[in-house]
Each structure stands twice: as structure tokens, then as C-alpha cells.
Regions:
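C-terminal target-recognition/interaction regions appended to catalytic cores
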Residues: 114-241
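Class I S-adenosyl-L-methionine
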Residues: 1-158, 236
């Protein structure tokens, strides 16, 4: 929604559809991810409007900027998480706290996948990929194929020994020489997806699914605390009865 400051005209603006579904389903709690730009001053009216709509539907709303790297994901990926809890539930939700340890580096995360095709340089590469990666972006239908982002992002990937202009279909072979590219499976792992997770479609479609996704470890941390809040309410209602 806020990535290019296109607001309501952006094809990625899903808030109207979300509001419609919330009104129809009336879930106990809601969790929505958005880009960091959602918190900028230019979107103040938009934020207030969203909060007002959710209040009319019977929800208390809060949002916070969370970094995926604080929850074990090996990339920066700062994202705004919007949480709304239905009014008939006790306000027992607490935001999750960061893990006490640093996330793994790109090299630590991907060394086995880089070596899967027999590439003899995988371990050396992993030692050089000694930091977390920049934010993985999925783009939209208006943008090109599966690259790792704009020029600045590709330069950041280059410092980690990754060519970001496109993706490989498979891991480097035994005699590969040069700077490797990521596969969709590698990108999925960097995004926090378990290896057994299945994606559908060709490479570009799969990459967009992964890049536009909410990292599962962050989603789990927030959802776990929401579940606790719901349990507190249920327990409260039983005792009150």
C-alpha cells in the first residue's frame, strides 16, 4: 500500500477487500502486514480512516514496526503489523519481543542448498556471506521477472556474494565459477518458510508468492500472542459466569 505512496490506487491495496471480509466474517482478531511507509506522515489520514472503519466494525486497533531479523529471519525486512481485536474480548494482547540471539547469516542459512549441486566453492562462499540479507521483494504484475530488487538492493546482495539480476533454476554445479544466484527454494528459506512448503507456478510466479509473503516466523510470533489473548478472554468469561 505505502511502498510507492500510491495509496488507494495501488493494485496492492487490499484494505477495502480486508474490511469487507472482516465485516462479513467478524473474526475475533485480525493481523495485517504492511510496508514501513505506512507509518509516514503522508498516510496519517489513511491510517486514521482504517482505524475508524475497524472501530465501527467493533475492533480495537494497534500497529507496530517489527523487524523480521528480530525473529530469526536472515533479512532486514522491517514491516508494519496491524493487529485488531474485537471489542467483546479483553484487551490482553502483548506484542512479541525480539529473540535474545542474532539471526543466522545468509551463508549459514543457505550453505547446504548452495552445495546441493556439488559446488565445491559453497563453504567458501558461505564464509563471505556473513551477514543478513536486504529485504526480499516480490514486486507486482507491472514489474519484470524474478530479480532481487532495485539497484541498491542488488549491490547489497553483491557484498554477500550473490548476483541479484535474476534467479538460478537450480543450485550451482560442481565446476561453477563466478557469483552464484539464488533459487526460489533459497529465497523461501531466507523468508523463513520451512523447506517442505510447496509453492505453485513457474519461477517468476513462485518468487512473487515468496517475496510478497509475511515471513512465517514473524507471523507465528504475533499469532501466538493473539492466541494467548483469546485464551485469556475465554478463561475470563468462564470464571465470570
Amino acid at each position: 500500500v505505502a511502498g510507492k505512496q500510491l495509496g488507494e490506487k495501488d493494485e496492492r491495496n487490499l484494505f477495502p477487500a480486508a474490511i469487507r471480509l472482516i465485516d462479513e466474517i467478524k473474526p475475533k482478531a485480525i493481523m495485517i502486514e504492511n510496508v514501513r511507509g505506512f507509518l509516514s506522515a503522508v498516510f496519517e489520514d489513511y491510517r486514521n480512516g482504517l482505524k475508524s472503519q475497524l472501530k465501527k466494525l467493533g475492533y480495537k486497533t494497534d500497529w507496530r514496526l517489527l523487524n523480521a531479523s528480530d525473529f530469526g529471519v536472515p533479512q532486514l525486512r522491517p514491516r508494519v503489523v496491524i493487529v485488531a481485536v474485537r471489542d467483546d474480548y479483553v484487551d490482553a494482547f502483548d506484542w512479541p519481543t525480539a529473540l535474545p540471539h542474532n539471526p543466522p547469516t545468509v551463508g549459514e542459512t543457505l550453505v547446504d542448498l548452495m552445495a546441493a549441486g556439488g559446488w565445491r566453492g559453497a563453504k567458501k562462499w558461505a564464509k563471505g556471506a556473513d551477514d543478513i540479507g536486504p529485504t526480499i521483494v516480490g514486486g507486482s504484475k507491472k514489474h519484470g521477472g524474478p530479480d532481487l530488487g532495485p539497484t541498491r538492493a542488488r549491490k547489497a546482495w553483491a557484498t554477500l556474494g550473490v548476483e541479484g539480476k535474476s534467479l538460478f533454476n537450480e543450485a550451482p554445479g560442481a565446476d561453477f565459477v563466478g557469483t552464484p544466484r539464488l533459487t526460489t527454494r533459497m529465497v523461501a528459506r531466507l523468508q523463513g518458510f520451512p523447506d517442505e512448503w510447496q509453492f505453485h507456478g513457474k519461477k517468476t510466479t513462485t518468487y512473487r508468492q515468496i517475496g510478497n509473503a509475511f515471513p512465517p516466523p514473524v507471523a507465528k510470533a504475533v499469532a501466538t500472542n493473539l492466541k494467548v489473548a483469546m485464551s485469556v478472554q475465554k478463561h475470563f468469561l468462564v470464571r465470570a459466569a
